[in-house]
Every structure is written in structure tokens, then in C-alpha cells.
Amino acid sequence: IFWGSISQCAAQKIAVKTNLLYGTYASSPNLETEFGISPRGTVDLGAGFNWFTSAHSSSNNKLVHWLGSVEYRYWTCERFSGHFWGIHILGGQYNIAGHHLPLLFGDDSGHYRYEGWGIGGGISYGYHFLLGNRWSLEANIGIGYVRLHYDKFRCETCGEKTGTENRNYFGPTKAAVSLIFLIK
């Protein structure tokens, strides 16, 4: 049974997936499509967004954003099976308020609203677990660099702009536990 699963996996050319961590933490619908380009190489295209704000919040808490990414993956055995290494680029726009994100915006980040964009890239490592003929689970983590450019606003009223800033971020750029459907 195990050998049959591995041989079927080698024939896979396309995977459609959703990152369960990102979807849960950021309440963000997201979708990725991964294409086989060689026996050990794939390209993963991902997108996620959150256009929702809390209707019950008088403090204007929000995590509004869109994010896109492209990753080349090199599989150590064969694509869509086992270990892989990747190199990725990412970019997006955001409007964030009421969230304490010190790695991105500093220690006082929970007291301001940030509206801007970011672009970056990094390297990643992951492992693909076969669950059945068509279903899989994948764990992936990445580190890298992101350049952030944003306008900063006082969060109490979220109207008074206090300045425009740039920030260089080095650290985790990817964390995923993805549910995958394999297409032949």
C-alpha cells in the first residue's frame, strides 16, 4: 500500500491547498496552487486576504490585508512527497490596528494603526505527509527579510497621521500547516 501511494504521488502535477494556520490566526481566506515543473521541482503560488473588520469593536481593531507569494521548491526525493527546500518572494498591503506586533512595528504597535505595503523574500523548509490517494497535509516554515513602508496613525481616533515610516524586518516569513488536494 505504501509503495502504491508513493508511485501515485510521483505522477501528481498540480496541488490545491489552504493554509490552516493562516486561515485560523488571521481569519483570512487563502488559497495556494502548486505546479510540478520537473521531477523534483514545483512552483507554489499563494494568495490570502482579510477585508473584514470587527463590527462589535469600538476600538477599530482590524487586520485588513491582502498577501501574495511565489515559491520555488526543490524536493529531496520526488515532488509532493517528503522533505523540500524552498525560496520564496512575497508582497502585500495592510491596514492593521489594535494588534500588538512588536517584531513588525515596534513595542508600542498596539496603540497605533498602520496602513502600507511590504515586499520581501526568504528560504523555507517543509515536509509533505500523504494522507490518501488525493489528500495530503504539509508543514512549512520560512525565514527571510521584508521591507515595510507605512503611514502611522493614532489608534484612538484612527484619523490623525503621525508620520510615514520604513522598517526592515528579519525573521519568520512563513508558517503553514496546509490541507492539500492533489490533482493528476
Identify the function of each model-found stretch:
Residues 2-9:
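C-terminal segment of classical bacterial N-terminal signal peptides
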Residues 9-67, 177-184:
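Short glycine/proline- and aromatic-enriched beta-strand/turn motifs that initiate or cap beta-hairpins
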Residues 12-14, 39-43, 79-85, 115-119, ...:
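Outer-envelope beta-barrel architecture signal
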Residues 18-22, 35, 45-49, 85-93, ...:
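Transmembrane beta-barrel strands of outer-membrane/channel proteins
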Residues 35-39, 74-80, 129-133, 183:
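Outer-membrane beta-barrel strand-turn architecture
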Residues 47-65, 94-118, 146-174:
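Extracellular/periplasm-exposed beta-strand and loop segments of Gram-negative cell-envelope proteins
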Residues 70-105:
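Helix-adjacent hinge/juxtasegments
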Residues 73-75, 169-184:
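Outer-membrane beta-barrel "beta-signal"
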